[in-house]
Amino acid sequence: MLMLKDRFGRIIKNIRISVTQRCNFRCFYCHREGEEYISYYEMLPEEMERIVKVAASLGINEVKLTGGEPLLRDDIIEIVSRISRIPGINDVSMTTNGFFLEDYADDLKRAGLMRVNVSLDTLDAEKFRMITGVDGHESVVRGIIKAVKANLRPVKVNMVILKGINEDEVDDMIKFAGDNGLILQVIEFEGPRIDATYEKYHVDIADIEDRIEKRSIKTIIRSMQHRRKYILGNNTEVEFVRPMHNSEFCLHCNRIRLTSDGKLKPCLFKNNNLIDILGLIRKGADDNHLKELFIEAINRRRPYFFNGNL
């Protein structure tokens, strides 16, 4: 089997697929998976399946489904089912805002989804409404609990730290995670571009991480992006995601992205090096041609942050 390796020696094992740009939330900080354009085109389930089959033949074995909000797709169960059955794919997961998760968790598990990440930045309903534009805090919490019961484990809660809004809630979120058998991911506010929103709400989470590290009984450094995970005394796991101006994060990135309209995207932070794989599928390209497109996309990868922007 071929192994995809870029010019910097990074082996690509993960494809992150945005299945839609649509979302029922309006989170003011959302980076939209780096898609800085509006597209009304979406891939069909069989088109995603074919792309993932090609990816699997090149050694990619992990698939993350994202959006937008993936549960807005009426055919999301079919998408999960098709992808989970592909030989060589051994991990299929999803990032969701959790609003519809209570209704979908059991069907997603039966279709082959293994685990979920759920976005939840606050335990305060009013703050939640301010961040998302939706009165949906209780629905998301119920979705998280249902995901645990459906055995979509580990269930990870993604908490983006926003200056002046939720820095003081980390300890409460750790308790929530511990009480419900969750992993907490503390995430630095990231953005493909530095704008007024970023300047207003971005905060360096190093101080928070230092505090949690001192409380931990064990530290694990993950191979993916060299993320640090801390095990606390009650066995609660807290992982830190610090992408901005972080050369270690970039140098150990093992993923490629597929946009909702079928373009291979080598880097979250760049939009000038996309490859339109869906367009060629719809023109009748064979699998060998699609493999060449993957290889070309991998060759376009370079660490965005490496002692500054390369």
Q: Model regions: which residues?
A:
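Residue-level signature of catalytic and energy-coupling elements of molecular machines
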Residues: 19, 184, 262
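Accessory C-terminal segments flanking Radical SAM cores
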Residues: 192-306
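Radical SAM/AdoMet-radical enzyme domain recognition
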Residues: 45-65, 69-185
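Canonical Radical SAM [4Fe-4S] cluster-binding loop centered on the CxxxCxxC motif
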Residues: 7-46, 267
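Flexible, acidic/Gly-rich N-terminal and inter-domain linker regions that tether
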Residues: 1-16, 22-26, 205-219, 305-306
